[in-house]
Amino acid sequence: MAQVLIVGAGMTGSLCAALLRRQTSGPLYLAVWDKAEDSGGRMTTACSPHNPQCTADLGAQYITCTPHYAKKHQRFYDELLAYGVLRPLSSPIEGMVMKEGDCNFVAPQGISSIIKHYLKESGAEVYFRHRVTQINLRDDKWEVSKQTGSPEQFDLIVLTMPVPEILQLQGDITTLISECQRQQLEAVSYSSRYALGLFYEAGTKIDVPWAGQYITSNPCIRFVSIDNKKRNIESSEIGPSLVIHTTVPFGVTYLEHSIEDVQELVFQQLENILPGLPQPIATKCQKWRHSQVTNAAANCPGQMTLHHKPFLACGGDGFTQSNFDGCITSALCVLEALKNYI
């Protein structure tokens, strides 16, 4: 039975797992490892510590589907709409740039519900707090070491974490990446930003006419969303949640500052945008060191195969673009590359 490891429980990794399960007729052991405490990657949904039903999307806010991808990836959209994982965005987002024919979708149960859907479909064994440190070749298998626990062996590996994290891995993988591939990987770049989630008590009123707003006149804040309103799930029994995304220049400037300092600065600027906001009962500040790809890997559409037997490839938005369709494209390319090795 083939033993497959997918590193990264984000959009690309979870879809790779689901597609692999659907397209493999024989027995298959499928493991998904992630360094975080939950699935989602940059499509993460945080919960209030006081009420798990009070949630906030700290990564991707909504999904924009262009006419090109509406046709090309129709089966993926149809499936998620049929399961109720996605729903058309019906709430007003001020300052959103709309192009003709584009459709926007939200995830009523939180954006991470997309990832949870695919992981469930995959039947994979999903492990959190598993940070991969080394990948070595041992008797035609991959031996994978993590920060804690014993090394484990696999026949095939797909790496879907941000490219700089792939380049940090130790072991034989460092010599298996060719000089040309290394240059391509080192040229991949990302923007950085912070996201802040604010959770409120039930009954709290945040009286604004919009569900989300792009801010153009603030050095710190780029986007604000009343998250439950954006997802059209307002309830008198569950408090509202607010999501703030910082600008990229702010994210870069304060990248190595403490979360507490950053949170305080964002709060100060938020007072200028939404004066007199009530006090939240909980907050969650998320640093996105690798937020969105600004330069994807050149000349390797969708994935990069680092080794054939045993198979090792990397995929993710670093090889396409930082959106839902970019991740689908990468997952399909990974599957195409490994189908002869499974």
Swiss-Prot record:
> Entry's SUPFAM superfamilies?
FAD/NAD(P)-binding domain
Report residues binding FAD: T12, R42, Q61, Y62
Reactions catalysed according to its record: 1,2-dihydro-beta-NAD + O2 + H(+) = H2O2 + NAD(+); 1,2-dihydro-beta-NADP + O2 + H(+) = H2O2 + NADP(+); 1,6-dihydro-beta-NADP + O2 + H(+) = H2O2 + NADP(+); 1,6-dihydro-beta-NAD + O2 + H(+) = H2O2 + NAD(+)
Indicate whether NADP appears among the record's keywords. Answer: yes
Task: Tell me the tissue specificity.
Answer: Secreted into the blood by the kidney. Highly expressed in the kidney, expressed at lower level in heart, skeletal muscle and small intestine. Its plasma concentration is markedly reduced in patients with end-stage renal disease, as compared with healthy subjects.
InterPro entries, per database record: Amino_oxidase, FAD/NAD-bd_sf, RNLS
Where is the protein localized?
Secreted
Pfam families of this UniProt entry? Answer: Amino_oxidase, NAD_binding_8
Q: Which domain of life is it from?
A: Eukaryota
Name the needed cofactors: FAD
EC number annotated for this UniProt entry:
1.6.3.5
Record's keyword annotation contains Transport: no
Name the job this protein performs. Catalyzes the oxidation of the less abundant 1,2-dihydro-beta-NAD(P) and 1,6-dihydro-beta-NAD(P) to form beta-NAD(P)(+). The enzyme hormone is secreted by the kidney, and circulates in blood and modulates cardiac function and systemic blood pressure. Lowers blood pressure in vivo by decreasing cardiac contractility and heart rate and preventing a compensatory increase in peripheral vascular tone, suggesting a causal link to the increased plasma catecholamine and heightened cardiovascular risk.
Protein family per UniProt: Belongs to the renalase family.
Protein's name according to its UniProt entry:
Renalase
Q: Which organism is it from?
A: Homo sapiens (Human)
